[in-house]
A protein has these predicted regions:
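Extended, well-ordered alpha-helical scaffold/bundle regions in very large, multi-domain proteins
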Residues: 13-14
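C-terminal amphipathic alpha-helical interaction region
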Residues: 6-9, 18-130
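Catalytic or ion-translocation cores adjacent to nucleophile or general acid/base/metal-coordination motifs
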Residues: 1-2
Length: 130
């Protein structure tokens, strides 16, 4: 659903959310530069992956859909943890943990979204048994 119906608008809904994440990260740079930069970089990578995904055919989108959803979740989680930490300094340690330990998982997930479906369709039951 995320990479099919929700991308029918050329990814506009995703871009609006990414814009929100980037604006918040930019605003947080003055008080939490390292955390904010990590969130901004991840959201920019998500933007680039979204652009690539929108340009793929539907089979290729579906092949990368789970990885894309997981990467999007990592970026949004980092965004919301950073916002919570800015609102309540007692939550900054959890935000830092999430951003430094869990957010980096977005990169290999986004790499998977670019692979398309060819490798999936090339797998045969026999190859899985080898």
């Amino acid at each position: 659903d995320l990479v099919a119906r929700k991308m029918m608008d050329g990814g506009e809904a995703a871009y609006r959310l990414i814009d929100e994440v980037e604006a918040a990260a930019e605003a947080a740079r003055s008080s939490q530069p390292a955390l904010a930069t990590a969130v901004w970089n991840a959201s920019e990578a998500l933007r680039e992956a979204t652009e690539a995904l929108v340009g793929q055919d539907l089979n290729d989108r579906f092949a990368g859909s789970v990885a894309y959803l997981r990467a999007f979740a990592r970026v949004l989680g980092a965004h919301y943890h950073l916002q919570a930490g800015l609102a309540d300094p007692a939550r900054l340690p959890l935000a830092a943990f999430y951003i430094t330990r869990l957010l980096p998982e977005y990169a290999p997930l986004l790499a998977q979204t670019r692979e398309g479906a060819a490798g999936l369709y090339a797998l045969t039951p026999e190859a899985l048994l080898a």
